Amino acid sequence: AAAYEQPELDEGTIDTADASSLAFKEGKKVFETSVMHNSEGTNALMSNYGIARDSGNLTFSGTSHIKHGSINANTRQDAKIIVFDKESDGKAMPILRIDDNDVQASHAAVVGRLNEQHLFYLESRGISEDDAKRIIALGYLKPIEEFFSDEEVLKMIDSAIEGGI
């Protein structure tokens, strides 16, 4: 399990945590992220995107805690997982702990099978099923690259994505 505990957010702090992951070949990945709003006017965004395939198991767990005295705090959690086959599993577990009023807190969690209509559309354009699945997977995982500028790191990310798809 990979755990990321963000520091307590002080007044006016803006924090983001973004993750993209691929669980495959009977691999099990668990990501736990937490953030604590400790004073007023703080902002946090957690975004998690992943794919489970080939008997892979992927779990995203996020906890956002807005403590008493943190008015005007804003926290949001987003998690999306595509499950490519019946042997694989995905779980998204957003947790919001709200101890004050006059705050904004929201979450969205989507775990679902590969959209057959998307697959059909690509195949109707002459793309093989394997290539169509690869294109969909790349579209899901590649956005993480926007957070990196180092060419070597980007090559490593591309290689990891290509090798797992």
Predicted features by range, described:
Residues 140-150:
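Short arginine-rich
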